[in-house]
Amino acid sequence: MDVVQQKQDKQLQHQTQEQQQIREDQQEVPPQRPRQQNRWKPWWNSTADDEPNTGRIAEYPNGQGRSSPTTDFQDSVNSNNDNKGIWSKIASFATSRYRSAPIVVDDNTRYSQLNTEQINFLENEAKDIISKKSKSWCWYEAIPHISNSSNIIDSIDTPGIISVSGTGSAKCPLPLNKYPGEGGNPGYNVFINDSLILPSDNPLNFLHVQPLRTKVLNTIKNYYNFPNEQHLYLRQKKTALLKDKRIIIISVVGDLPEKYEQRSLESQRSAYYLSRKLSQNLAQEQPQRVLTLSFQCPLHNQDLIPTYKECVELLNHWAHLFKEVDSIFFVGVYHSVPLTLLLAKYIVQNNEVLEFDENTTVSVLSFQSCLQGYRFWDHSTDFTSNSYNNLGSNSSTNENDSNDHDSNNDFTTKSQQIKEKQLFQGIDKKQQDTLSKIKNYRRIDSSESKLVQDALDWLLFNWDTFRLTFFGKLYDNFMTISEKLAIDYNHPKILRNLWCNGKYMGIDLKNANNLNLDTDDEATSNINDVHVRTPNFESRLKIPTNRLFEITLWDILMITENLGYKQFIPIINLLSPFFISRSFNDYTLPPNIRKQYQNSNKIWLQEMDSKWKMNGHQLNYDQREGESLGSSSESLLPENISTVKDFLQFVQYQNEKSSDFVRIYSDIYDDDKVYKCFLYNTIFTKNPLSRKHLRLNIDLDTPTSILNTVNQYDLVWKIHDSFSKLIQLKNLPQREIPHALRLSISLNCFLDSTTSTSGPVFQRDTVEALRRLTEIWRTYQDWSPPTRGLKHLRDILSVLAMYDNPKNLINDVRRT
């Protein structure tokens, strides 16, 4: 028995030693990251007391914590998200790699309660999730006053507060010294814009104040349920509308795989950048304060609803910011626009809890929206010749018209599948499944589309001050104008603008000798004679004569669209596909054009090498670090660079040689006029007299192919019919037809070139409509576009060349 007892004692002692060793090993070895992440739960039940003690970074009304109504706001979050039960009663834990005791992060956790090790762990955890792009996260920042930072777009060192879904910072937001995401350039940020906005960068140029007679008529029409107020009217007061106002900017951007982004949008900016850019333009209006919430969301591998819930969870921490706010501005890009509208509806629905009233302005800026989905277009020679030859051989035995029609449908479906496969090349299956749902917005009866329709309809009908501004590119390789501007969504409070890039209108800023400034002084008509002392310059650049037709045509179409003349929607749908080309994206250039561009660029670089290296004009980081942040940086210019031509060449040469040091911004997201236009569309327009619901058009006009003969005949008849409707329009704004782009060069800072104008003249006759048709005929005679689609459109519209003068054209369309 003694022997047996001794063996049992030894076994017990051995087991005790092993358990002790395991505990010691667990204390010494830090936990693995994946296991750590799995311990976090999706929390939806934040309380009103959940606020970090962040010192000077966080702003609270009257210097106090959140107000009591916020508790109701949290309760509404819980009920809306259907997350009740045991999860609301369990705290969230994270095991520190520095401590054996766990970090408890729950609704009652204060930032001031955390020690250095815990803070470091939570910060590293948040940054790790951000780098993986697997969860939604929000960056809060109080924008400094314009007098303290004139060039705020160049500063990423402004402190803010980070909150990442699925981490401890989702419960206890963390103050950081600088923005944790991608962005920021240690060198120079040079903004070069040669662009034009249609119909105008200011609604004052195509809208007017509602006359008393019109107001009475609209009231009577509304009483009898007749159509009325087809468009917005201007306010009487148009000055200091944002001065001393409290403003919140909410930017929402969805991540995209790099290759997908390049093939579709060419590029997009971060939510942080969009918030900064809009706040920079707001600074000119002298608001009392500007607060920003920048949401970066994993919409590339996560569906809309889960992402929406994550954003709502993060919004709970900032409920106190909305108290007595005067304006809330939203910004969304492409597939984040639906999420932006859902968040806007959620915030507005809770306005009483958030303590802002119905007078608060709510407005959404949409870049390249996906609300109308997309389909693929390709007008390249190799695609059309090979595919249609194969189609002809396969259907040659089928003489029946219905069989031919089926073959065309089969070809269209197959071609769409081929292009979609190219778009999704290089991304995983989950991302493909998620991103492929974007095209479902094309069907107005799809679940994706209905969800957005309901949110947008609620905002348009229930919130008088709500505005929606769609911005899209005229020249694109992916989506048509109708798709980007959601042309089938009709409501007076929806405004649409087109952004035209001079790069795709035959204007080459590298070869500045061919530029033609639009000045009244003949002495400065040559760009070599325009001298600059600083890297800030603004002028107008003449549009080449052989491309004026495109601008003239779309200018009047955008005017009619924003004035509520929906009878022109069919022709917009028919014309839009012709402005699609692979050449309108640097990442989708056809091989022959890419090779041609590379050869010409190589020659240009050799010329610039000999020009600038010989003279010793080189930039370095030491020089940049020696300058004050946000300065105009005159040292960017070598001493003997004194003209616009030399500056353009020098900056673009430096950008080619060291793009990480000299970075050029020239896309739609970088144009200050876009943001000013959005603000003017919002604050200068008057609320309609009566509420209206969103109306949807059923698109039966967009062709399946621009090369289809039936569609070509249809376009000829539709354009003729549109001309006959155009010359009947009365009270069109009498203003100059655009013939010049805005050329702007700046180093981070905003060039405020706003000039006070008397606005256009409105007369109740057809004089302006006739003048517009005359200009369409005149500019067509010189039209010589470069791309296959536009050349094809020119051939289809060759009927315009049959008329000897515009009077004959006018007389002809009058007879129809």
Curated annotation (Swiss-Prot):
The keyword Phosphoprotein applies. It comes from the Eukaryota. Keywords: Phosphoprotein. GO terms for cellular component: endoplasmic reticulum-vacuole membrane contact site; fungal-type vacuole membrane; peroxisomal membrane; vacuole-mitochondrion membrane contact site. The modification Phosphoserine is found at S76, S79. Residues 64-81 have a biased composition (Polar residues). Residues 28-44, 391-400 have a biased composition (Low complexity). GO terms for biological process: sphingolipid metabolic process. Residues 1-81, 391-411 are annotated as: Disordered. Present with 279 molecules/cell in log phase SD medium. This is Uncharacterized protein YMR160W. The lineage of its organism: Eukaryota, Fungi, Dikarya, Ascomycota, Saccharomycotina.
